[in-house]
């Protein structure tokens, strides 16, 4: 990579439509878990969240934090250990079970009667509830309003054609004075079809700008050796804070 391509000042790719017809099915996501193709999972948690977590929480306790497409994110334990309640949604039952096993947490499971085949897994301590279903089937009316969202790997995984529906779902879950931390990726989408999908700043404005103040907290070079196989030569990760207008 030449020096200009490693710069954090690389302009975002102007064509936001290039990936609009890309689709991954729920079955394909489940297969990724079964086949161990989960390089997106961060065993040590997300370092940008770790860096900004105390600023994000502002010393509060008892908050309700939502993890869309949660997988087995270790960050759920971070919030629970700080006295917050975690609600997650994940299509892979395997991912949910691995979370509880790897975090040494006992849990219960029960069916969600209004959603055929869906289940909810709850930690025995009661402060982590993970719903195994599609994000669009998530029983929103049952859980009440949430204070925070940590979206790392959700918006960038949702099929581009479903983003507006996804954003509206997220916003419908939030109560007053909400905060949302959102991570997205910037790269040349003509070279890699996704996922993770390319989400430029303009798309975040389109999806959330009417309801939210949007502030980019940090931008980092996220390019690793494995990303060369994607055909790209740079990858930036951006952390946004969305707050109620």
From Swiss-Prot:
Q: Which PROSITE patterns match?
A: SAM_MT_TPMT (PS51585)
Localization, UniProt: Cytoplasm
In terms of SUPFAM superfamilies, this protein maps to:
S-adenosyl-L-methionine-dependent methyltransferases
**Gene Ontology BP, a term:** methylation
Q: Where are the transmembrane segments?
A: none
GO terms under cellular component: cytoplasm
Q: What is its EC number?
A: 2.1.1.67
Record field: catalytic activity: S-adenosyl-L-methionine + a thiopurine = S-adenosyl-L-homocysteine + a thiopurine S-methylether
A Pfam family the protein falls into: TPMT
Quick one: which residues bind substrate?
40
Q: Locate the N6-acetyllysine modifications and list their residues.
A: 58
Protein family according to the UniProt entry: Belongs to the class I-like SAM-binding methyltransferase superfamily. TPMT family.
Partners and quaternary state? Monomer.
Question: What's the protein here called?
Answer: Thiopurine S-methyltransferase
Origin species: Chlorocebus aethiops (Green monkey)
Recite the lineage of the species.
Eukaryota, Metazoa, Chordata, Craniata, Vertebrata
Gene of origin? TPMT
């Amino acid at each position: 990579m030449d020096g200009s391509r490693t710069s954090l000042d690389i302009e975002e790719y102007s064509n936001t439509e290039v990936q609009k017809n890309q689709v991954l099915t729920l079955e394909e996501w489940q297969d990724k878990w079964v086949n161990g193709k989960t390089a997106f999972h961060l065993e040590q948690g997300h370092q940008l969240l770790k860096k900004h977590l105390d600023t994000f929480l502002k010393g509060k306790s008892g908050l309700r934090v939502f993890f869309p497409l949660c997988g087995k994110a270790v960050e759920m334990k971070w919030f629970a250990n700080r006295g917050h309640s975690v609600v997650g949604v994940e299509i892979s039952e395997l991912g949910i079970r691995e979370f509880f096993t790897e975090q040494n947490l006992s849990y219960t499971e029960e069916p969600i009667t209004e959603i055929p085949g869906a289940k909810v897994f709850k930690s025995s301590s009661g402060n982590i509830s993970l719903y195994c279903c599609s994000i669009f089937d998530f029983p929103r009316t049952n859980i009440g309003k949430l204070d925070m969202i940590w979206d790392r790997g959700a918006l960038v995984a949702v099929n581009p054609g479903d983003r507006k529906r996804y954003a509206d779902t997220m916003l419908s879950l939030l109560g007053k004075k909400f905060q949302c931390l959102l991570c997205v990726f910037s790269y040349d989408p003509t070279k890699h079809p996704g996922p993770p999908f390319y989400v430029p700043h303009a798309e975040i404005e389109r999806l959330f700008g009417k309801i939210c103040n949007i502030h980019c907290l940090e931008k980092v070079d996220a390019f690793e050796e494995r990303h060369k196989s994607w055909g790209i030569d740079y990858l930036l990760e951006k952390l946004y804070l969305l707050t109620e207008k």
